[in-house]
Regions:
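N-terminal start-of-domain structural block
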Residues: 1-2, 127
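Aromatic- and Gly/Pro-rich amphipathic surface segment
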Residues: 27, 32-33, 37
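Glycine-rich beta-alpha loop elements in corrinoid/cobalamin-binding modules
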Residues: 35, 39-45, 50-160
Length: 160
């Protein structure tokens, strides 16, 4: 059985904050996130072809647009790339939207925010935090979920 996964970039700005018109210019430009795009490539390279990339950071969609995306794209596992600690409120907001749409989705958070993994796991809807490089952990989670589907068992974060 195929595992449907979605990797998402997470904005660093506070939710609801006013964005600059040209976010990619100026002294602190918003740049494409290399780690999450590399992880997406690694996922596809390792045979998990059902992986989509949702660039929330660059698109900066409203809550209703995020909800629409996840209602149209049923995911077994969602990866959130939180590159800085200021992403916390965004992770909290986005993970809540995902769980409201798809309560069975396993939400995985990676990036520097996971230095505070205990807080992220207690205060958000994130199920798993990956600390450090995520390529091996992410494909391991996808393999685990794929095996769980084949054996008709539930993916449980405490077993990982």
């Amino acid at each position: 059985m195929k595992v449907n996964s979605i990797l998402c970039s997470v904005p660093v700005e506070t939710p609801g904050g006013k964005l600059r018109r040209k976010r990619s210019e100026g002294p602190s430009p918003i740049m494409p996130k290399i780690a999450i795009t590399s992880l997406n490539h690694w996922t596809l390279k390792n045979g998990f072809k059902q992986c989509k990339f949702y660039d929330i950071d660059m698109l900066y969609p409203e809550d209703k647009d995020i909800a629409k995306f996840f209602s149209e794209n049923d995911a077994d596992i969602v990866g959130l790339s939180a590159v800085v600690s200021t992403s916390y409120l965004q992770v909290k907001r986005i993970s809540k939207i995902i769980k409201e749409i798809n309560p069975k989705a396993l939400i995985v958070c990676g990036g520097y925010l996971t230095a505070a993994a205990d807080t992220v796991l207690r205060k958000t809807d994130v199920d798993v935090c990956v600390v450090g490089d995520g390529e091996i952990a992410w494909t391991g989670l996808l393999a685990y979920a794929s095996n769980a589907q084949r054996s008709n068992t539930k993916v449980r974060s405490e077993e990982l």
